[in-house]
Amino acid sequence: MGMSWWLACAAAFSALCVLKASSLDTFLAAVYEHAVILPKDTLLPVSHSEALALMNQNLDLLEGAIVSAAKQGAHIIVTPEDGIYGVRFTRDTIYPYLEEIPDPQVNWIPCDNPKRFGSTPVQERLSCLAKNNSIYVVANMGDKKPCNTSDSHCPPDGRFQYNTDVVFDSQGKLVARYHKQNIFMGEDQFNVPMEPEFVTFDTPFGKFGVFTCFDILFHDPAVTLVTEFQVDTILFPTAWMDVLPHLAAIEFHSAWAMGMGVNFLAANLHNPSRRMTGSGIYAPDSPRVFHYDRKTQEGKLLFAQLKSHPIHSPVNWTSYASSVESTPTKTQEFQSIVFFDEFTFVELKGIKGNYTVCQNDLCCHLSYQMSEKRADEVYAFGAFDGLHTVEGQYYLQICILLKCKTTNLRTCGSSVDTAFTRFEMFSLSGTFGTRYVFPEVLLSEVKLAPGEFQVSSDGRLVSLKPTSGPVLTIGLFGRLYGKDWASNASSDFIAHSLIIMLIVTPIIHYLC
């Protein structure tokens, strides 16, 4: 009896030690901004061998990044959306690039058994890269699923095609497959899954969730992965086209990480001619590393250490703002367009001051002090509370301080990437009707400001020190998901938005 008791205790202690050893408090993350090799424009599909040749060219570059990341001790690496075959496809021209990707529940290591599900050379290579380098590999590729055309959901060509993220663990096993839910305009080559997929997997360094590019602007699967599935880290392959002033890749992705309280690994394509750049590794309290490069054609590998289980303190986004008397000065207000949305603005007249500006149910409050008030630069403080209807439909509440492109107030909200005015301090808040608010601070030359600001528990975005560079944007980007398809979004409102779109610019500002 005594000996059995001691043996049981020893076994339990041993199991505890193994469990502890297999659990990591921190991990080294890597993301790779990939300068994708694009296929030639064609109206007709290429052969499968031609498609595979192009994909292997891109996989050669991804292999270099994966091997380098593993040598430096990274536990996981994320590569971009469309990183294996590029962009600009039709439904037919993408087909030679697709493979059938099985449900990860099949327990499959493609590197060991590549023919189990037919011809899967891309999955085989990704699996071997993960296995041979003992690293988790996250990639984006195309999935094909045959269907019966007698099924009303089945496309006429008899197959579903999905924009798909795959994850292989350090043994080369397929552990996650995610079909992109929120397809962006121009992605006609892919189908939308009939139901959102909430894809997670566990590792010794936390619980991970996966979604892609345009998904970040919507509730499912993005928000649900955090609020219901309790993931620690989001993996985010993307092909994101920057939209200044408030939707630059590094700006919004880092803001989402802070607003949702998770780690966020964002790998973007690198194609400056298409405004595609901006990758990073973001923690809930601050960006850890970021990359933005419009000048070169080179890819970039980033590393950062992250906590496996980050701690996030809750924020009451209306607590402070609702206590401030809302008395906007009507005579100072003007209207200007930010990414097709009509904001209500006030000009910042002095080197320091306090302003309130309201639109519909949202009132925004600002206290600030500039380092100097330049005659050649104008800053404005604005509010928007309404339904965005161009290149997607989603309800926004935004408080934003921004540099205007010129001293003409009508340029407030236009894209600008340089500034000269630093801010000694700022405090920004708003009466948001949502708990999903994402804090943004963007500096001149499209740089982030890690460690220079924080969000207080009462909902203020406040500076911790003078800004290290001139300011482009300081904002609180709120999403009211429940109003995206509200019946009170009148046809007159949508028509007005379309008129604005036609008047402001003939150029489409693609996101991803």
Curated annotation (Swiss-Prot):
Changes after translation: N-glycosylated.
Membrane-protein topology: Lipid-anchor; GPI-anchor
Record-linked InterPro entries: Biotinidase-like_euk (IPR012101), Biotinidase/VNN (IPR040154), C-N_Hydrolase (IPR003010), C-N_Hydrolase_sf (IPR036526), Vanin_C (IPR043957)
Sugar-modified residues: 132, 148, 316, 354
E.C. number(s) listed in UniProt: 3.5.1.92
tRNA processing found in the keyword field: no
Chain residues carrying a lipid of type GPI-anchor amidated asparagine: 488
Annotated Pfam families: CN_hydrolase (PF00795), Vanin_C (PF19018)
Domain (CN hydrolase): residue spans on this chain: 32-308
BP term (GO), one: positive regulation of oxidative stress-induced intrinsic apoptotic signaling pathway
Keywords: Cell membrane, Glycoprotein, GPI-anchor, Hydrolase, Lipoprotein, Membrane, Signal
Stated role: Amidohydrolase that hydrolyzes specifically one of the carboamide linkages in D-pantetheine thus recycling pantothenic acid (vitamin B5) and releasing cysteamine.
Family designation: Belongs to the carbon-nitrogen hydrolase superfamily. BTD/VNN family.
The name this protein goes by in its record: Pantetheinase
Originating gene: Vnn1
